[in-house]
Amino acid sequence: MLHLLRDLFIIKRKGESFMSIRIGILGYGNLGRGVECAIRQNLDMELAVVFTRRNPEDVRILTETAKVCRVSEAEQWKDKIDVLILCGGSATDLPVQTPKYASLFNVVDSFDTHARIPEHFANVDEAAKQAGKLGIISVGWDPGMFSLNRMYANAILPEGSDYTFWGKGVSQGHSDALRRIEGVKNAKQYTIPVESALEAVRAGENPVLTTRQKHTRECFVVLEEGADAARIEKEIKEMPNYFADYDTTVHFISEEELLTQHGGIPHGGFVLRSGVTGWNRENRHLIEYRLKLDSNPEFTSSVIVAYARAAYRLAKEGQTGCRTVFDIAPAYLSPTTGEELRATML
């Protein structure tokens, strides 16, 4: 029924009519499927096409009216979609794909390698400006919603301390690292905030916390037959950049237990700023923002789709180049008019 409504959907605001925002998805993994589901909940949008590196005949999507095409066919859709959402990985896909496709489409990505965001921004900005397109990068919850809350909190409380805690939730990157270990058949890793550290921040103690003091890691590992459990546990706990700096617990479980008890991809976390105001800094304040997510990729996708609306609107205004969540006014995200927002949410 929703897709029938979308086919007929014309929004009228102050006498102006416009059709649905036509979305393309590049990459159909967990994030791509999440974007497809999110589009279904936004009646001013329609999914037009999914681009895949796989054989299109092997890709089964949920939207009956959308097409599945090879990535090599993307250029043929240059004038058929309004925004292309890039759902690849940050390690190797997005650094290449986002600048490339910003020369053809208005684009949105979820690039999350924090240290490389300035470089990625510059590359996308150059490509988008040359093509007269608009790109929004690093959209999601961290970077994304957490970033916005850090910025707001720092602007409001210029004297203070920032804290970010992640979890409890599945870290897909750390889970991948576990699965790369010889003898590991499958695995999930949870990042867990240290409750005493979180409470110290909430109490206004402004603690100086090490990596180990902020989070613990819990691993659920399925072994290949005959694998050396002691060796694997030691290798996990000593793995640099992933587990060596944390108190890590390793559980060896069956494949069935992993699938039934750890089949989801939950996540979340906290962004806090503890600060002071007053002539003599006599008053303390705490700003806390929390996310608790059943599905990390589906929530990330929902944020991305809201920013796809912003990309469409900014492009319609003639804006070009790259943007981040810092650069975009909140009203651009909403399907509601400014008049309605002021009447109902302000």
Question: Locations of the language-model features?
Answer:
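Glycine-rich Rossmann-fold phosphate-binding loop(s) that bind the pyrophosphate
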Residues: 28
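NAD(P)-dependent Rossmann-like dehydrogenase/reductase catalytic/cofactor-binding core
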Residues: 285-346
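C-terminal substrate-binding/catalytic lobe of Rossmann-fold NAD(P)-dependent oxidoreductases
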Residues: 22, 33-34, 41-74, 170-308
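Rossmann-fold NAD(P)-binding glycine/threonine-rich loop
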Residues: 111-135
